Amino acid sequence: VPAGGAVDTSFGFVRNFDDFNRIAIDTTNLWNANVDAGGTAFAVNIQANGVVRGTVDTDDNDNTNMNGPVIYRADSGGPLICEWRVAPITSVANGETFVGLSDATTDELPIQVSTTDVQTDAASDAVGFCYTGGGTANWKACGVDSDVSRTPVVCNQTFTDATGAPTRVTTPVAARFQTLRIVVLESGNADFYINGSWQARIDTAVSPDVLLNQYLAFLSGTTARSVDADYAYVSCGRRPAT
């Protein structure tokens, strides 16, 4: 059994990988798909490899999100790993996007960052990537620990984009997928990766003893837009709380 996992079983880690390759998104057993008036809830969109897509209309602050069961904890023999492969569709000109982990199935944007990088939290504990159209460039690594915001960190380390070119600009591009990965240690410290390249570290980004769930959410600005998710992965140790 790898270090950290439960030692009384050969399945010492809890994992879930959803490749969205079914006929329909599983909103009975795995995902909550929430949507405000005018938008479209996340649903399977017929494309190569299988994706799900959610949309928002032009009404400012309309929210579309999908989130899973609140069962994952960083201090259960971590690390707690969350990875999404996502792409904005149509526009990144405005509106807010959150990709990561949160602490509830509430219909909300767990963390958002203003155009001047001021963080606002709806969740008490969450950790993830935030992007605000019309704001400063690049994804921001963000966390909130027991209602205390951590300082957003700009993700601008060199990585390889979808065209194979090295770049330090992580700003999402319409119709181009990026792989966003968060690794939360048992201490609550979190490392952030884009397309496999390390981007940021936030110390005590989130409370390690709080149960979390996968969470993808975005708000409209004044432009109708969509977000595609190609897959979602999460894993953590199976060790019980002591």
How would you describe each model-predicted region?
Residues 20, 82-84, 175-185, 190-192:
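Short tryptophan-centered beta-strand motifs in secreted/extracellular beta-sheet-rich domains
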Residues 145-179:
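Short, aromatic/His-centered strand-loop micro-motif at the edge of beta-sheets
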